[in-house]
C-alpha cells in the first residue's frame, strides 16, 4: 500500500486515528498513559467508538485498541479484557533468539496451544460477537497485538519459514546524506547487536511468524463475518498503527520518518458494494487520519467539527479522484514527513531535510533535498507542512524521549542531547 500512519509509534498513532486529530493539533506527540490525564486534556475529543455509541450503535472491543487506556462504559457497550484473566505461562522452544534479559526481546516460538495466546482470545471475542443476533447496528473493534515485540508466536507459524529469510536491500553508508536528527532516530545500537550476535535472520523469521499468526486470527474474524447474517451489510477496515524496519536503513523497530516505519497495511471493504469484483487500489499517499471521517460517511453520520482528514468514500468508488492532501506523519514536535504518490519530503525541527523520488529510489537511498533540480517538488510538498503546532502535552507522559524535539527534552534518567536519544 501507500498508506501511512500519523505518527510512527503505538500511542500517538492510535490517538490520532481514534480521536481524529493530528498530533500537531492535539499535542499528543509521544507515549502517554491516558488514565492519568486530567479530563480537560481529552474532553474536547470524542473517540471513534464513543462517536458510534452516541449515534445509537452497540460498541464492542477487545485487545489493543487504545494504547494504555482502560476500557470505559462511555466508549464500550462491552469490552473483553484478557488482562483480567489468569494467563498460562509461555513455554518456549529451544530455537530462536533472545537478546539480553529483556522479555520484550524474545524472538522465539512457543509450545502453548493456540488458545493460550491473547490474540486468539481477542479474535474469539470478535467471532462470538458476530455470531450474536443484534437488535441495533454495532461497531466492533478487535486489536490483534502481534507483530508487536516480543516476536513470539505458536511454533507452527515459525515452521512456515524453515529457510533463511531473504534480507532487505541495505546500503552500507546509507546515513551519510541524512541529517543528524534522522540519524539520531535510527538507533543503530539494535542493528549492531543483531549483527554481532548473527541474529538478524532469527529476528526477521520471528517477525514473519508473528505476521502469519496475526493473519490467522484476522482470517478467523473474516470467516465468522462471512458465516453471519451481517456478511453483506458491514464495512471492514484493516489497519496497523505504524510500519516496521527490519534492517532497512540500518534501523530496527519504528520511531523514524522513513518509508518502512510510516507505511502501513490499510484495506477498506464495504460488503454492501456487490458490484465490485476486484479490489480498487489508491496510488496516492493515504493517511490513517481519514478513517474517522470515512467510517462516519459510509454510515451516514456527521463527525464533530474538529475531526481532521477527509472521507475516502469518493476514492473508494473512483481511485483516480484527486486527493485533498497527501499523507503527513510526525514524530515529535517539529519533525514531519509528507508522502504523496511518488515523493517523500521530510523536514526536521532544525531545518534538516530529506527528499526521495520513489519511482527511482524506493529504498530511499539518495537524499535529493540539496539538489536545486528538485526544488519545485520540495516546495510543493513543504506547502502541506503544518503552519502552526501546539506544544507537547506534558502531564501523564511516560519516561520517553522524542529524538531532538522542538520542545525542551523531556525528563529522562539519562541526559538527552540533540545528537542522542534514549534507546527503547
Annotate each language-model stretch with its function:
Residues 1-348, 353, 362-386, 397, ...:
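Formylglycine-dependent sulfatase
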Amino acid at each position: 500500500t501507500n498508506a501511512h500512519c500519523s505518527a510512527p509509534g503505538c500511542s500517538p498513532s492510535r490517538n490520532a486515528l481514534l480521536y481524529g486529530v493530528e498530533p500537531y493539533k492535539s499535542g499528543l506527540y509521544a507515549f502517554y498513559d491516558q488514565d492519568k490525564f486530567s479530563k480537560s486534556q481529552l474532553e474536547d475529543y470524542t473517540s471513534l467508538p464513543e462517536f458510534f455509541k452516541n449515534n445509537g450503535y452497540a460498541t464492542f472491543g477487545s485487545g489493543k485498541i487504545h494504547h494504555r487506556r482502560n476500557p470505559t462504559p462511555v466508549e464500550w457497550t462491552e469490552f473483553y479484557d484478557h488482562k483480567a484473566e489468569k494467563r498460562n505461562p509461555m513455554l518456549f522452544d529451544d530455537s530462536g533468539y533472545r537478546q539480553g534479559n529483556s522479555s520484550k526481546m524474545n524472538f522465539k516460538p512457543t509450545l502453548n496451544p493456540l488458545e493460550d495466546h491473547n490474540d486468539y482470545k481477542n479474535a474469539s471475542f470478535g467471532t462470538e460477537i458476530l455470531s450474536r443476533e443484534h437488535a441495533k447496528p454495532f461497531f466492533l473493534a478487535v486489536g490483534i497485538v502481534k507483530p508487536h515485540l516480543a516476536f513470539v508466536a505458536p511454533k507452527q507459524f515459525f515452521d512456515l519459514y524453515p529457510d533463511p529469510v531473504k534480507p532487505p536491500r541495505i546500503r552500507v553508508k546509507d546515513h551519510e546524506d541524512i541529517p543528524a536528527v534522522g540519524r539520531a532516530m535510527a538507533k543503530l545500537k539494535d542493528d549492531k547487536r543483531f549483527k554481532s550476535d548473527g541474529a538478524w535472520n532469527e529476528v526477521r523469521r520471528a517477525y514473519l511468524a508473528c505476521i502469519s499468526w496475526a493473519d490467522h486470527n484476522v482470517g478467523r474474524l473474516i470467516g465468522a463475518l462471512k458465516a453471519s447474517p451481517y456478511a453483506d451489510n458491514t464495512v471492514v477496515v484493516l489497519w496497523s498503527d505504524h510500519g516496521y524496519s527490519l534492517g532497512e536503513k540500518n534501523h530496527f523497530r519504528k520511531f523514524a520518518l522513513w518509508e518502512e516505519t510510516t507505511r502501513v497495511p490499510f484495506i477498506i471493504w464495504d460488503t454492501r458494494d456487490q458490484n465490485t469484483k476486484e479490489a480498487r487500489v489508491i496510488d496516492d499517499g493515504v493517511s490513517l487520519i481519514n478513517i474517522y471521517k470515512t467510517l462516519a460517511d459510509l454510515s451516514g453520520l456527521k463527525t464533530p467539527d474538529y475531526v481532521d482528514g477527509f472521507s475516502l468514500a469518493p476514492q473508494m468508488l473512483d481511485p483516480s479522484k484527486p486527493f485533498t492532501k497527501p499523507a503527513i506523519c510526525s514524530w515529535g514536535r517539529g519533525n514531519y514527513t509528507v508522502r504523496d504518490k511518488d515523493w517523500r519530503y521530510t523536514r526536521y525541527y532544525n531545518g534538516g531535510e530529506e527528499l526521495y523520488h520513489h519511482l527511482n529510489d524506493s529504498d530511499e537511498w539518495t537524499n535529493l533535498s540539496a539538489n536545486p533540480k528538485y526544488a519545485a517538488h520540495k516546495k510543493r510538498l513543504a506547502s502541506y507542512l503544518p503552519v502552526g503546532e501546539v506544544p507537547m502535552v506534558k502531564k501523564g507522559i511516560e519516561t520517553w524521549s522524542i529524538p531532538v524535539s522542538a520542545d525542551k527534552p523531556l525528563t529522562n534518567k539519562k541526559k538527552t542531547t540533540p545528537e542522542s536519544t534514549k534507546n527503547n
